[in-house]
Amino acid sequence: MKDELDMNANLLVEFLQKPSAEFTKADIVSYIKEKNIRMVNFMYPAGDGRLKTLNFVINNAAYLDAILTCGERVDGSSLFSFIEAGSSDLYVIPRFRTAFIDPFSELPTLSMLCSFFNKDGEPLESSPEYTLHKASKAFSDVTGMQFEAMGELEYYVIADEEDLFPATDQRGYHESGPYAKFNQFRTQCMQYIAQAGGQIKYGHSEVGNFTLNGKIYEQNEIEFLPTRVEDAADQLMIAKWVIRNLAYEYGLNITFAPKITAGKAGSGLHVHMRIMKNGKNQMLANGILSETARKAIAGMMCLASSITAFGNTNPTSYFRLVPHQEAPTNICWGDRNRSVLVRVPLGWAAKTDMCALANPLEPASHYDTSQKQTVEMRSPDG
């Protein structure tokens, strides 16, 4: 636990010295008072996939307690196409574990993601966050295990073309400056996302890099660490919001579109998954892919058409899912293969202590690498 709190980038975790999963209303109030926070934002995804925001000025302590406890009502028909205007009122209730400081607000502002509730005070059955929660709970109830996930968030930065140090077309993977033009933008995005609670694995420039009609198109990626599947989804929502807002401040344009033009790399939203039990990764057994992992992969193969229906709702997805573009075109799986539907990436299964080999002064590490193995669904995007 101490290792998770030390050097934690989340500003509230750093102050409260507890993981975000343990945040209480009293913790939120304490932080607001100590840091002289003047506003609170409720944020929640709508049917268009964007985060919506409701602003509150903290009038006094009683009002703060009221909004944190009772939430607020909103017009569901303006958020979701499946809700009729004749009976559209919904409640939005903040989830304290998602609290973060808004890096873009001039006034000190604390934001939280919210859950939707219906008129009877019950979770809205068709809301995005509750649908995911039900699926996660059903998995745990049936298997006795926990489903964890993380996303690879790919996007293009679009800016005016420049002549200095031009990048090589479609050779932008892990490129450094000055050939990669937007490393500073990406690292600032990563800083803001981490301060908001995002568990980031790494960031880098991606393959896609081209010019078109006087504009530079540079592809980048921010990848996360495996976590509870509901938290993984929350982190992706906040990350997209951060990237768009920071791009606006920089005077840049951003797109998460699956495909911009033919022959150039598309942007996916690859999802890595692992199955946990009692804190142990169940994806490996004796250094090879476990029966549990193989059953999970088989399930993804069987449900490929349904997964595609939900994971590829943008028509341009189907210009991305073409041969020779590191995108799946067949229902199959394989080790280390970026053209299959489900990829089994390198998982540090070899017993070699590579750190000690690269650094002869280091003692044997005895690091448990079994936690690192995942499988990756490569079809989703958007």
Where is each model-derived feature located?
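ATP/Mg2+-dependent ligation/transfer catalytic cores
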Residues: 1-210, 227-241
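Generic secondary-structure signature for well-ordered alpha-helical cores
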Residues: 137-144, 191-198, 245-252, 278, ...
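Gly/Pro-rich turn-and-neighbor structural signature
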Residues: 204, 223, 237-262
